[in-house]
Amino acid sequence: MDRFVSHFTNRLDAKGRVSIPASFRAVLARDGFEGLYVHPSIDAEAIDCGGHGLLREIDELLGRLSPYSEERDMFSTALLGTSEILKVDSEGRVVLTENVKTYAGIGSEVTFVGQGYKFQIWEPGRFRTHLEEARNRVRDLRKQLSSRPVAPDAQPPRPHGARE
C-alpha cells in the first residue's frame, strides 16, 4: 500500500530520536524520498510529514495560484519556508528539531497519524483531543449529508459491463 494509514505512539529516546513506524517507513522507501520532509501543519498543532507525495500535493496547490500573488507567497512561506528535511538513520529513526517539538508541543512521546499521501506527528494528548473533535464533526456532517434529498436525475451505478 502506498498510503500512510493508522496511528502509532512512540517514545523519544535520550538523544531526541524517535522511530518512524515500519509501515510508514515502507511507504517512504517506495516513494524514493531521501529523508523525511516536514513542515508545521497549517490546520493543526502538528507536523505534516512525507516524501515526494507530500511535495507533489504542495506543488499542485501552489500551481493553482498566481505566481506573484499574495496568496501564493503566504502558502509558499507556510509550506516551504518553514520546512525541514530530517535525516532518517539506518534504524528508521529521526531526530526531531527544537522547532518541530516546540510547534507541536512535543515532550517525551509522539503519535504518528496516517493521512494518505502524508502523515502527521502529534503530541499524544493533543491528538486524542483532535480525534474526538474530528469524530464529532464527521458525525454532524454525516447527519447533514444523509438528510439531503437525492437528486431526481441521479442514477445508481450499474455493474461493470451492464447494458442499458
From Swiss-Prot:
Comp. bias intervals (Pro residues): 154-164
Biological classification of the source: Bacteria, Pseudomonadati, Pseudomonadota, Alphaproteobacteria, Hyphomicrobiales
Keyword flag Transcription regulation: yes
Subunit structure: Forms oligomers.
Keyword Zinc-finger tagged: no
Name the UniProt record assigns to this protein: Transcriptional regulator MraZ
Annotated segments matching region Disordered: 141-164
Record-stated family: Belongs to the MraZ family.
Cellular location(s): Cytoplasm, Nucleoid
Organism of origin: Beijerinckia indica subsp. indica (strain ATCC 9039 / DSM 1715 / NCIMB 8712)
Record keywords, A-Z: Cytoplasm, DNA-binding, Repeat, Transcription, Transcription regulation
GO BP, one annotated term: negative regulation of DNA-templated transcription initiation
Domain SpoVT-AbrB: 7-60, 83-126
GO-annotated cellular components: cytoplasm; nucleoid
Pfam families: MraZ (PF02381)
PROSITE patterns: SPOVT_ABRB
